[in-house]
Amino acid sequence: MKTSLFKSLYFQVLTAIAIGILLGHFYPEIGEQMKPLGDGFVKLIKMIIAPVIFCTVVTGIAGMESMKAVGRTGAVALLYFEIVSTIALIIGLIIVNVVQPGAGMNVDPATLDAKAVEVYADQAKDQGIVAFIMDVIPASVIGAFASGNILQVLLFAVLFGFALHRLGSKGQLIFNVIESFSQVIFGIINMIMRLAPIGAFGAMAFTIGKYGVGTLVQLGQLIICFYITCILFVVLVLGSIAKATGFSIFKFIRYIREELLIVLGTSSSESALPRMLDKMEKLGCRKSVVGLVIPTGYSFNLDGTSIYLTMAAVFIAQATNSQMDIVHQITLLIVLLLSSKGAAGVTGSGFIVLAATLSAVGHLPVAGLALILGIDRFMSEARALTNLVGNGVATIVVAKWVKELDHKKLDDVLNNRAPDGKTHELSS
């Protein structure tokens, strides 16, 4: 039985976003006061992310016949992440050089309000390769869950899954308990998602109310350029990858449309993580693959953020007339290949990584961040949406490469020919 239009989450979130935009535009002061609604919803989602990742990864790994398959999946995923995120960085670099949205602005860095970006610059000082690696190791298991650090929880879950697998039949009771706990957690997710329209309304009303449409007009060329680049990346790059894998990118986008709308409202791809874990498994990807690829992708496969970082850095150089010859741009690309891996899928993280990149490159003024501070919030929607689609496609591709993809189920679900829960024999 089909859900009526008015009862569908897709329609409710879309309506809430539209109402939020109108409220923020016509009554900006009231719109700004709606911020707790958006923040509250995102906090509810973050509350559940750690246990979802733990349960999904542990049951996925412990339930596998061979531990070699887990290592192979991880290696394939990291290889894919590096290739695709590099393509995203290069595309951003090419487009911003061709369009040159910052050319002619002739901004003197000395006149910019450096205090406005001090908080991001300070946070960026902690962004280093060694610091990033050390941060993956939690000081305590409880601390990892309490802080909601995705990579720390993932590391513990992988180790726990390996250990549980080695116990064999002795660990069956623990496995069953975690699997039952997982069902409870996903039940909680279903309850939280009913609040998605309220969260999307609050976040959008606040954004428009605080920053206004005037900010959009002022630096509109960069925003439009970035959005078009993200669309082209999804359609051409991810679309080509999807076609080579045996599915349509447009049908996949339709399949995750509710998650995309939630991300559009909250500007954080992290807000859709729990549902993506569930939906990718229902699409025919083995649980162990989903549990490894999706959480890891939130730090290593942020395609939208990669495009944003190159475009924003070169835009600042163009606007402040800073020298950016081919050597400087190659240096920028190399730095971003490393620094972009530290961006989690949460609102504002891309801006912090950008600050770290400008500091590392040296010849670009960090104060130039003030130029895009006002519009960063509007660009985060495109970043988050591209990140979400990119991680979904990555999961299917990796699942196919390691022969853990149910092709029949994938085809049936995307073409609405079978219920999500129906299973088919795995094909190689």
UniProtKB/Swiss-Prot annotation:
Keywords, in A-Z order: Cell inner membrane, Cell membrane, Membrane, Symport, Transmembrane, Transmembrane helix, Transport
InterPro entries: C4_dicarb_transport (IPR023954), Na-dicarboxylate_symporter (IPR001991), Na-dicarboxylate_symporter_CS (IPR018107), Na:dicarbo_symporter_sf (IPR036458)
Domain of life of the source: Bacteria
Gene3D superfamilies hit by this protein: Sodium:dicarboxylate symporter
An annotated GO cellular component: plasma membrane
Chain's role: Responsible for the transport of dicarboxylates such as succinate, fumarate, and malate from the periplasm across the membrane.
Entry protein name: C4-dicarboxylate transport protein
Organism from which the protein derives: Shigella dysenteriae serotype 1 (strain Sd197)
Encoding gene, per UniProt annotation: dctA
